[in-house]
Amino acid sequence: QLTRKKLKPIVGIGVGTPGLVNTREGVVVNAVNLEWQNLPLSQLLEKKYKLPVLVLNDSQAAAIGEFVYGGDHLPDENLIVVNVIHGIGAGILINGQLFQGDGGGAGEIGHVVVLENGELCRCGKRGCLETVASVRAVVKQMKMDSLDNVISVFQNGDSKAKSVVDRAGRYLGTSLANLVGT
């Protein structure tokens, strides 16, 4: 639709996707929540839209978006943006530059083990942060069908909801403290 409107020339497409991304190749190496492995997303979209495509981890893209458009950030600022949805990820900027780490996985905190012998995660490990603190995990622990329902009972003072949310918050908070402290 945007290409037909031609308000300004479109020079490329940027895509944020969950999971481990090889940004140079435009390949989603592993996105367990989408069941994607070695998906050449950039190539597929370039073929369809005839435009260059940059594929980036969604949390990393969010961090860049916050840095550029979110406020009065200093050029050499350090910043962490955390996404908590089906999975948990962080986008990290150090001195105003995106930090991806070797292999692009910096910030993939959802698969850090926080609970020894915990629930089996979709990644194959046990006790990952995502198994206790993601939206999916909280909804599952509450035996409900949506986050809206969890929020509703939480706001109405449900003790189980308070316990589940408090536990998720403790694990997430500890993980973020460890991330900031590294």
Question: Model-derived features: where do they sit?
Answer:
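Phosphate-binding/catalytic loop of phosphoryl-transfer enzymes
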Residues: 9-124, 128
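ATP-binding/phosphotransfer module of carbohydrate and carboxylate kinases, centering on a glycine-rich
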Residues: 1-11, 24-25, 47-51, 70-75, ...
